[in-house]
From Swiss-Prot:
Mg(2+) or Mn(2+) required for ssDNA cleavage activity. GO terms for molecular function: exonuclease activity; iron-sulfur cluster binding; metal ion binding. It comes from Francisella tularensis subsp. novicida (strain U112). InterPro entries: Cas4_exonuclease, CRISPR-assoc_prot_Cas4, Dna2/Cas4_DUF83, PDDEXK-like_dom_sf, Restrct_endonuc-II-like. The keyword RNA-binding does not apply. Mn(2+) binds at H50, D90, E103. [4Fe-4S] cluster binds at C23, C184, C187, C193. Disulfide bonds: none annotated. Induction: In culture expression is high during early log phase (1 hour), decreases and then rises again in late stationary phase (16 hours). During infection of mouse bone marrow-derived macrophages (BMDM) expression is maximal after 2 hours, when the bacteria is expected to be in the phagosome. This is CRISPR-associated exonuclease Cas4. Its EC number is 3.1.12.1. Keywords: Antiviral defense, Exonuclease, Hydrolase, Iron, Iron-sulfur, Manganese, Metal-binding, Nuclease. Disruption phenotype: No effect on expression of bacterial lipoprotein FTN_1103. Bacteria are as virulent in mice as wild-type bacteria.
Amino acid sequence: MNMDIFDNDLSIPVNLIRQWCFCPRIVYYQELLAIKPNKPLWVAQGEEFHKKVEQLEKRRSFSRYGLENAIRHFNLSIKSQKYKLHGIVDWVIETDTNVYVVEYKTNPNPNSLGHKLQIAAYALLVQEYFAKPCKTTFLTSDKKSYEIKITDELINKLIKTISDILSTLDSGNKPDSSASDHQCIQCEYYNFCNDR
């Protein structure tokens, strides 16, 4: 997706937030230079994992999440002009009074800032879409779930990150990278960084 940075309705895909946390240059290469590398093997594995988990979740109760009566919404596409975000939420659990985001990961890391900010972004989207609070989310694999609370501190970090991404897209300047050598080796844009 190439973004028109002069578009007043510009919104960024939520998955860019996690990418930005991994390395801001990914956003630069992907969105401003429109470089589309081949998908690494783990991306295809993740897509298969999502399909498998969705089929399993359709048959499960809500007890894993401490809920009883609820409605499931899978792969919900949402856009918010207010937050300048859009994305496809893996799964939303809707009760009479609240909504809960469930984000699938093959290797969920509840301590990863990228994972936390991504799920917080989805929480903002579903909260606006359903007009119900979303203060609790779940980062889950096929075996384990981690509860992530949506705090004011997390939302403030998210808003700053969105602002930083939009500023980079607006300026067109290649951002600095704080990625470690270990992160760089995993990156599909590694060959494009001439200072790494």
